[in-house]
Structures are given as structure tokens and as C-alpha cells.
């Protein structure tokens, strides 16, 4: 963590290189440093459960089938994803001792507030910025038990039992938030090397994928005598690298799959809303985005997956459930060319 002195130096340097004039007092620079620390603390607690959830939403439903397909077979799927929001990640507790500038307005020493995937409850935080009072309403969560979003997927069969996989979701507007995912991968059939497995209609496949998730939420709308502070939109950017093993058994027109998923995700955070009026004096959004690097993180996840796929001519209906820390379900309707 930066020392207090280093934080003020950072603000001062940004002022100089932004070409802005400033006559702000030392007290303002100190208070802004404290406010940045408070925003950083709250950002981490608020958005991390949502980015954890985004990994689950992007991780399941990659594999249509574990069996070896014919060269140049193409499958296109229209998917609806259902993420079940767990109670344990819907809220977190804050205490006055967590903050340097702000405090809970009601006079309480602690309070429970929603995460980005929590409910719509709000409280007020208050403080003084260079002697002028500020009042902040904590952000709401999406207030949904199940998050539903659509996405497209596809698979192209190449040589030697290898397939190229793609997944794409347009930017979906959820309640007080937006979500987008895209990714690609490679699947290779392993059971082709074991004739006894193929003879019994048992299939094995290994898959490697990459996906990028972008989740954005309404954040802190802070009005001050210096203008809006421009930290009203917070985004989580997640890069996920995944390995997956699947086994399946065919029963006439039904294929039942079971899989094991292991992935590693890099989490980054960024303020992406419209810059506030304070930017005419202090490049606050830039400073905060630099400080948000302090809460970047890398996490590993391990999850199971079960799936059932039913064929109706060239149309396939598939239901998938992935489970681990969270539970995520995907319903897919596919057409095979």
C-alpha cells in the first residue's frame, strides 16, 4: 500500500502533468487521499462477488458433445444462461473503523450493505471534503435471485477429432448493470485412441478455452462543491483460462455428459463512467484507476459439470449444470449443419 505522503505526491504529480492549475489546500489533498482509500476498500468488497460469479457464468456450457465428429461439421447454439445468486455473497458488513474520511450517517458503528449481486438496500455515508460536507448513498445490488442472460455459441470440426469452439454474448443490460462475455477454445476427442470405448459408445474429450468477461455496475454518485467526482460506474474485467475433461455415454438419441473444470482467472477493475466536473481541476478518475490496481487478483476455481443432450433430427436440446462455490445452469438449442 502507498504511504500517506506518496498518495498526496501522486495527486500533485497528476495535477502538474494534466496541465491543470490548482490552489487547493493541503487539507483537500489529504481528504481526497482518504476518500480514495475509502472508495478502494468499498470497491473491492462490492464488486468481487460479481466477478467471481461471472467466472461461473462463462465457464459452463462449452462442450456440446464429447464424441468425435465428422470433418467440417458445424454446430450453432442459442443459449440461455441461469446463474443462481447465493445468499452468502449478497451482502457484506462495513464498520466506521474501515474508513478514513467517511462514516455511517445514522450514528451506528457498523452496517450491512449489498454487494453488486445483492439486494436493493441502501444506507448513507457522510464525511467532510476540505471542510464541506458530502453525503454518499451506497450502491444497490441487482436484487435478483436468478440472473438470466442469452449468448451464442458455435463449434467447427477439424481434422483428427479436433474442434474449434466460440462463445459470444452481446452487451446485456441487467438491472443497474451490464454483462458481456466472449471466448474461444479447442476441444480434442480422446476416446478415438481407445477402440473399446468407441465400441461401447463411451466418449472422452479434453478442452482448453479462454474467455473474457466484462461486468459493470452503477457505483457511487458523489456530489461535492467541486462538482461530481465521476466514480458512478465500476467495471470488473476478467480473463479466464480453462481446462476441462468430459466423458459421455450415448443412449440412442441421448448423450449424457459429466465433466471436471479447472480454471484460473485474472481480475481487473476500472472506473468506466462519465468523468466528473472535478476533472477540470484534478484527474480523479485516472488516480482511482491507478489505485484500483492494488486490488487486482488471480483466483483458481474447480467445478463439476453434468449435461444431457437430446437429438431431434438436426436439432439438439441440451441442459447443463455447473457446480462448485456457485451453481450455474445453461439451456441450449443447437442446429448441426
Give the ranges of each region predicted by the language model.
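Residues that define the transmembrane beta-barrel architecture of outer-membrane proteins
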Residues: 70-72, 145-150, 178-184, 200, ...
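Residues on the lipid-exposed face of transmembrane beta-strands in outer-membrane beta-barrel proteins
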Residues: 65-67, 76-78, 152-158, 184-190, ...
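Outer-membrane beta-barrel biogenesis signature
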Residues: 23-124, 199
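Short loop/turn motifs that connect adjacent beta-strands in outer-membrane beta-barrel proteins
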Residues: 64-72, 87, 176, 191-204, ...
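Bacterial Sec-dependent N-terminal signal peptides
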Residues: 1-28
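Transmembrane beta-strands of outer-membrane beta-barrel pores
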Residues: 80-84, 168-172, 190, 208-214, ...
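Repeated loop/turn-to-beta-strand initiation elements of outer-membrane beta-barrel proteins
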Residues: 160-164, 193-196, 253-256, 312-319, ...
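Extracellular/periplasm-exposed beta-strand and loop segments of Gram-negative cell-envelope proteins
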Residues: 89-91, 128-144, 173-179, 212-240, ...
Amino acid at each position: 500500500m502507498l504511504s500517506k505522503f506518496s498518495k498526496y505526491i501522486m495527486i500533485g504529480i497528476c495535477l502538474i502533468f494534466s496541465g491543470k492549475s490548482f490552489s487547493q489546500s493541503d487539507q483537500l489533498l489529504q481528504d481526497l487521499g482518504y476518500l480514495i482509500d475509502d472508495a478502494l476498500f468499498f470497491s473491492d468488497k462490492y464488486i468481487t462477488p460479481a466477478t467471481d460469479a461471472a467466472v461461473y457464468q462463462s465457464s459452463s456450457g462449452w462442450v456440446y458433445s464429447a464424441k468425435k465428429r465428422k470433418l467440417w461439421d458445424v454446430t450453432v447454439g442459442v443459449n440461455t444462461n441461469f446463474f443462481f445468486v447465493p445468499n452468502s455473497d449478497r451482502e457484506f458488513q462495513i464498520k466506521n473503523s474501515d474508513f478514513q474520511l467517511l462514516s455511517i450517517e445514522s450514528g451506528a458503528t457498523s452496517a450491512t450493505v449489498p454487494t453488486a449481486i445483492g439486494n436493493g438496500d441502501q444506507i448513507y455515508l457522510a464525511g467532510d471534503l476540505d471542510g464541506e460536507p458530502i453525503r454518499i448513498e451506497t450502491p444497490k445490488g441487482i436484487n435478483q435471485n436468478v440472473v438470466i442472460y442469452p449468448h451464442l455459441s458455435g463449434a467447427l470440426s477439424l481434422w483428427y477429432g479436433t474442434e474449434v469452439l466460440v462463445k459470444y454474448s452481446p452487451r446485456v443490460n441487467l438491472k443497474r448493470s451490464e454483462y458481456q462475455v466472449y471466448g474461444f477454445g479447442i476441444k480434442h476427442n480422446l476416446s478415438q485412441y481407445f477402440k473399446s470405448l468407441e465400441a461401447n459408445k463411451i466418449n472422452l474429450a479434453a478442452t482448453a478455452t479462454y474467455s473474457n468477461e466484462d461486468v459493470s455496475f452503477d457505483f457511487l454518485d458523489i456530489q461535492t462543491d467541486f462538482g461530481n467526482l465521476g466514480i458512478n460506474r465500476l467495471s470488473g474485467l476478467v480473463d479466464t483460462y480453462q481446462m476441462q475433461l468430459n466423458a459421455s455415454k450415448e443412449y440412442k438419441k441421448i448423450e449424457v455428459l459429466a465433466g471436471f473444470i479447472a480454471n484460473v482467472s485474472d481480475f481487473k477493475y476500472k472506473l468506466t463512467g462519465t468523468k466528473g466536473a472535478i476533472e477540470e481541476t484534478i484527474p480523479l478518475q485516472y488516480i482511482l484507476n491507478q489505485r484500483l490496481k492494488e486490488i487486482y487478483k488471480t483466483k483458481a476455481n474447480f467445478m463439476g459439470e453434468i449435461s444431457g443432450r437430446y437429438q431431434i433430427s438436426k436439432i439438439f436440446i441440451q441442459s447443463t449444470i455447473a457446480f462448485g462455490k456457485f451453481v450455474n445452469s445453461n439451456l441450449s438449442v443447437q442446429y448441426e449443419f
